[in-house]
Regions:
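Binding-site signature for planar aromatic cofactors or substrates
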Residues: 1-197
Length: 197
């Protein structure tokens, strides 16, 4: 199968693929793997949800004191990976991470369900806990604390924008003769290269 659609700008191509994924994936086409690395070079990955994207980059939100938050603080680079099984496609993105503005983070936090807002305060993300009741008690405590009031965004919870420097588009084809297109940012322009599968 040949992919006919070509783009000079990889963000345009991502947008086209993502819109197709939203129609064909049964749930969460915005799910992506985020891979980071610790100060001593230990890699780690986890699934998160992309909350926005544009020409400036790809945005997700997290507890900045979590493992990924501390790794990003020490090494502000990451790799994202989208895989859409229904389309037999994946997109791999590499780049540098930058914090979103407080205003942008506040707007998104305000849009979250109240339970998720409480959860952001209640969970000491990535830290050990004795048992599940510790989390339940923390949720109950913060539910009571914020009863009848607007919940503000925690200072340790915000968004990160990955500014892409490379994107690889992978399309499954017969006999493992897959199509691989890599876009790399050179100066202010994108250069596209085809790779052997």
């Amino acid at each position: 199968m040949r992919v006919q659609m070509t783009c000079e700008d990889p963000i345009d191509k991502f947008s086209y693929w993502f819109e197709e994924a939203k129609k064909s994936e049964p749930e969460l086409p915005e799910a992506m793997s985020v891979s980071t690395v610790s100060a001593d070079g230990q890699p780690s990955s986890r699934m998160v949800l992309m909350k926005a994207y544009d020409k400036k980059g790809f945005v997700f939100y997290t507890n900045l004191e979590s493992r990924k938050g501390t790794e990003i603080h020490s090494t502000p680079r990451a790799a994202l990976l989208f895989y859409w099984k229904s389309l037999k496609r994946q997109v791999r993105i590499e780049g540098q991470l930058f914090p979103v503005s407080d205003e942008e983070a506040d707007i998104y936090f305000k849009s979250r369900p109240r339970g998720s807002q409480i959860g952001a305060w209640a969970s000491d993300q990535s830290r050990p806990m004795n048992n599940e009741s510790d989390l339940e008690q923390s949720v109950a405590k913060h539910t009571e604390k914020f009863a009848g009031s607007t919940i503000k965004r925690p200072p340790f919870w915000s968004g990160l924008r990955l500014k892409p420097q490379a994107l690889e588009f992978w399309q499954d084809r017969c006999f493992r003769l897959h199509l691989r297109e890599v876009y790399r940012l050179e100066g202010k322009k994108w250069k596209k290269t085809l790779l052997y599968p």
